[in-house]
Amino acid sequence: MSGNGTGTLLHGNGHGILRQPPPRISQTLTDSCWAAVLESWSKVDSRIAAQTQATLIQTFGEGATGGITPTTKIPALCSAFGLQYRVFVGSELQHYLQEHLAHSYVFCAYRRDTFAHAVLIYRLSGRSLTHVSYMDPDGGYHRWHSTEWFSANGPMVVMRK
């Protein structure tokens, strides 16, 4: 696997797109999931300069919890790191991943309670391509959910290289 984010297509009995699992990074503040995701992403994609949560929070964060306002900060993050973003309902995620995951990890901020939570998607698998694997900075774990679960937790913001 190269450091530029090239995905590996699974063949044989496996179906889907698998990227190198990113390092597990735990968020350091209540709302700094976005910064932990970008730090993790920068460690596996040489197209993004190495980042730390602390620097990202200092530069882009808002307030003591380290959160951001997506409507203003997502475009700023995209500009700073050469990313592209989209906002859509959850049902579009599967198609988006099929189109872009082979070329880039995908930052995904979905609705969790009354706030948004960011994760870094690195795999789309299963016979129907409905299993989404991601690095979750809430505890710093690798987890998975179905595309249906993401659909139920939309709308969402996604970013890719």
Where are these regions (language model features)?
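Conserved active-site-adjacent core of cysteine acyl-enzyme catalytic domains
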Residues: 4, 44, 54-161
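Active-site nucleophile-adjacent alpha helix/oxyanion-hole segment immediately C-terminal to the catalytic cysteine
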Residues: 2-64
